[in-house]
Amino acid sequence: MAGQSSAAIARTGNNPFLRFVAALSTLAGWCSAAMIVAAVAITCQMIFIRFVLNGSTIWQTEAVIYLAIGATLIGLPYVQRLRGHVNVDLVPLALNKRLRFALAVFTLSLSIIMVSIMLWCSYEFWHLTWERNWRSDTVWGVRLWIPYLALPVGFGLFLLQLIADMVAMLLGIEKPFGLEDV
């Protein structure tokens, strides 16, 4: 029971909202990639300082951790746009078109609800760190609202991409689960 998936990348048609969200998700993907490159460069610099120059490092480890986590969160909408998340389509393949559509609406709705909750909680957490001017307890003492900003931004962009996916499916631009009619 194999289906043909057309979901290599989210379709936008000529819908301006979908095109805008796709552009935002792509920009987020590029930012995420840049953060990973920066983390690798900082790691190389840290290795050089510690093992070649026999010096101490202060900020590098913490910066790499924040960059890697931030890249993961900021990259969420881009991965969703490319359909890079894990997708098991055994159940959708076994359903007829009507039930497949209903299942897609249900799963996207549930995802939107869950990511909305994560967005709300992450915004509250970020705002608390900003309001109280929390700093890390390391020598570097980074203001934590800066790296924690990746939480609400990442979940917000991910939510926007999920909403765009729902809109594309409801408008008939995208097929449920990216499966051609089987």
Q: What residue ranges belong to the model's regions?
A:
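Alpha-helical transmembrane segments and membrane-interface helix-loop junctions
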Residues: 1-182
